[in-house]
Amino acid sequence: MKNLILFILFIGQFTASGQQVVRHTAYSLLYSEEHEQALWVAYTLTKKETIAQFSRSDNFRPDPMIESKSADDLDYIGSGFDRGHLAPAADMAWSAEAMSESFFYSNMSPQNPSFNRGIWKKLEEQIRSWAVVYDSVQVVTGPVLTADLSQIGPNRVSIPKYYYKAILDIREGRQQAIGFVMANEKIIWPIRNYAVSIDSVEKITGIDFYAGLEDELEQKLESHL
């Protein structure tokens, strides 16, 4: 099950210069040296894994697996932005190793504090609820990275204007998917206002999310909300 999301994502996918695929214990990512953060982070979350066994480690640190070196403390300190998790720490609380690895800077992105602690957190909580209801979900999440973004820190970490999530329930008889795109700012409206089709997420990110699925199923999942 843990490799399912990797299969769905990686089939037919290629990495560009300055990008690196990294696989950690509980999640995988595609790191962008240009933007000093992940283009996407992907993981499976099961019902059992929503039961927290470990507390937050808060040991923010560079990712030793990033060959070009990742962002670090100096990029975020005093910037006014939160070190926003892409794969949430709360989704990794089932394992001490997974929890610790969720604090790698390769899993961080500069987020408006009101956004990170507000609607983004609520969406993360909603996804955990879906994992309980549907037994497991496949999650892909990340920033929308473009060439015109402002930057912070010595490593020039890009500040995304938008973030996305794509959630997939691929179990037989219950095949469904939903996407979300949200601005990196304080948001007062309900989560449902930002629900979109996977096709819409693909258009704004340029990522082909479910290339490993059969074409007919991929089209069905991506075109419907």
Annotate each language-model stretch with its function:
Residues F14-G18:
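Sec/Tat signal peptide C-region and signal peptidase I cleavage site
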Residues Q20-D82:
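Short, His- and charge-rich active-site/binding loops that engage polyanionic ligands
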Residues N3-Q13:
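Sec-dependent N-terminal signal peptides
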Residues I66-L225:
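Domain-level detector of nuclease and nuclease-like folds
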Residues K2-N3, Q19:
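N-terminal capping/interface segment
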